[in-house]
Amino acid sequence: LMNGMKQANEVMFNLLDSHDTKRLLTRCRNDEKKARALLAFMFAQTGSPCIYYGTEIGLNGENDPLCRKCMVWEKEKQNQDMLQFMKRLIALRKQENTLLTEGHLEWNLLDDKNDFISFSRTLDEKILI
């Protein structure tokens, strides 16, 4: 049974927003720092991270149909800081894929007062906190 859970987790399709939900940035009340923390958390989990189009450039939107608005293609209208953050997350996931998907997960610190949580992944001599 426990082996089955590991296998299921390894093939999970992880997402934070979709065509059926409010966009991530909207759910975070346009708090980009919170959205980035959630994206980083998702990229540190087993399974496949899925990015809904526009999340990488800070597209917002309420429930359907506002979550399905057109992609913003004009670079000057995109959040380039968010895009660079996403590129760094993707690069980290590629570089440390084995650690992030096979490493031992340990919850280190939970601070409800400050809405803070910490975890680490360890594999052999590598550790990511």
Q: Where are each of the predicted segments found?
A:
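Alpha-amylase-like alpha-glycosidases and glucanotransferases acting on alpha-linked glucans and related
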Residues: 1-49, 57, 111-113
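Short clusters of hydrophobic/aromatic residues that line enzyme substrate/ligand-binding pockets
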Residues: 24, 71-73, 99
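Short helix/strand-capping turn motifs
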Residues: 48-51, 65
